[in-house]
Amino acid sequence: MRKALYSLLFYMCICLYIYTPVFMANLKEIEVGNYFICNLRDYPTGNCSVDHDYNKTIKLLCPIVNNKNNSNKTYDPSYCFKYDGIKDEFIINNKQAYIHNTLPGVILTNNIENDTYNLSIYPPFVVKEDVTIVCICDSEKGNEGITPYLKINIKKTHGLNNDLEGDYIKGCDYGNNQGKYKFLTKPVKYTSNPICEIDAYPGDVVGINCNSYTTKMQGARLEPEGCFAMVYFSILTMKFIKTNVNNIMPNAKYYPDLASHPGNQNSKIFLTSYLLIPNEVDRDILIYCNCSYNGNKGLAIYRIFSTKAS
């Protein structure tokens, strides 16, 4: 009897393993671990709504419509914009309002998988007022009058726990974004300030940005690729090695997570990254990333101390 019961349980586990992924792939809204997935690939006339949570990654699956120009393999950033409501059963199209006007420091990353845009949306860690944004998909043939979309409700935020000392995230912005576009503490020009230094402590969020929201910057790149997942590291000396940040701070979190998807085309548009330093750091360390512009570099150095200064 017991052997028969074990055999039945084993059979049930195999069935769940085989069939659950297929079943989940046909759900419109999926929550798995720390992911919320809006699946508009299989629901091309649908929509989703979610409240943003920094502990969850929000993903949108959009079908690639063949009659569109997708040669550069990027998800068009103008497809994400501030939500202005529904009129006559259609979403109000506000694509002219660039997403950075609403959320300076937002990141969109995209991977192409099975003729599908696999988009991840990372709002910044400072949001000055409650806001709702939408990201839309192209309409498929036969559904031209219907716009599939994901709606994201984002609450006013002042750091992860309202713990910022100022109004901005600690970090180096070699895009020199200022005024309404400012989101990092140090907007700088690499031509006049090739070195930017940040002091950080356990629990801090730090950032880097290489992109200007107002001026086209030729040949901009964030190095090492995948920063802050990968960083140049030193124990407060000037001898650096490239390593995964979790080798030196095991509980550190980085946004976006591009470790498994190098060469992400949308990340080359946004050129922004954040690092959440864990609440416990064993020792003082030094890391850096840089913004590269056709061989010229802006160096962003982060001195991370194990304890806060008294």
From Swiss-Prot:
Keywords: Cell membrane, Disulfide bond, Glycoprotein, Malaria, Membrane, Repeat, Signal
UniProt note: phenotype after gene disruption: Cells lacking both P36 and P52/P36P show attenuated infection and do not form a parasitophorous vacuole within hepatocytes.
Domain of life: Eukaryota
Signal peptide (UniProt feature, chain positions): 1-24
Stored InterPro entries: 6_CYS_dom, 6_CYS_dom_sf, Parasite_Repro/Invasion_Surf
Function of the molecule: Involved in sporozoite infection of hepatocytes and replication therein.
Keyword presence, Transmembrane: no
Protein name: Sporozoite surface protein P36
SMART domains referenced in this protein's UniProt entry, alphabetically: s48_45
Glycosylation sites: N72, N114, N118, N290
Pfam families: s48_45 (PF07422)
Annotated S-S bridges: C38-C48, C62-C137, C80-C135, C172-C196, C210-C291, C227-C289
